[in-house]
């Protein structure tokens, strides 16, 4: 189930039931916010069916697509439109957060993926989500931050 309210969104899922892909079109308030587009794309990537995402606000909001593909997502981009065909499972991979919203989508995809997902560039995610790994861990997610010293 998915609930999208004025100030929040909730997604409930179980491994026994695949959710249905959704179509969204971003536009200025009060329409669907561009800041949630990447997370919905991660949701559609593992949902049943095909979701169409139209990005009307920012031209560069699909930067996370190559990394979702690396995890097994079936996504095709044509200009400002992404076609997301749901797959039964994603696979852990080494990916890079190139921006805050795309990075959070990679975290969500990584939580659902089979195997280990390593995300570099998490400093960008930190800008918008304080202690996100602690929050997700408190909800039962298997996630940890590992510092890498060069």
Residue ranges and their predicted role:
Residues 8-9, 72-79, 140-150:
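Short, well-structured beta-strand/strand-turn elements
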């Amino acid at each position: 189930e998915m609930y999208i309210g004025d100030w929040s969104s909730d997604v409930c899922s179980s491994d026994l039931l695949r959710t249905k892909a959704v179509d969204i079109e971003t536009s200025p308030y009060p329409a669907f916010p561009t800041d949630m587009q990447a997370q919905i794309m991660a949701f559609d990537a593992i949902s049943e069916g095909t979701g169409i995402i139209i990005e009307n606000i920012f031209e560069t909001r699909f930067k996370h697509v190559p990394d979702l593909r690396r995890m097994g997502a079936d996504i095709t981009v044509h200009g400002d439109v992404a076609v997301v065909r749901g797959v039964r499972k994603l696979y852990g991979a080494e990916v890079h957060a190139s921006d805050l919203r795309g990075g959070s989508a990679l975290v969500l995809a990584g939580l659902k993926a089979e195997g280990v997902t390593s995300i570099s560039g998490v400093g960008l995610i930190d800008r918008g989500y304080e202690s996100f790994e602690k929050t997700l861990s408190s909800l039962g997610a298997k996630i940890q931050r590992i510092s890498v010293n060069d």
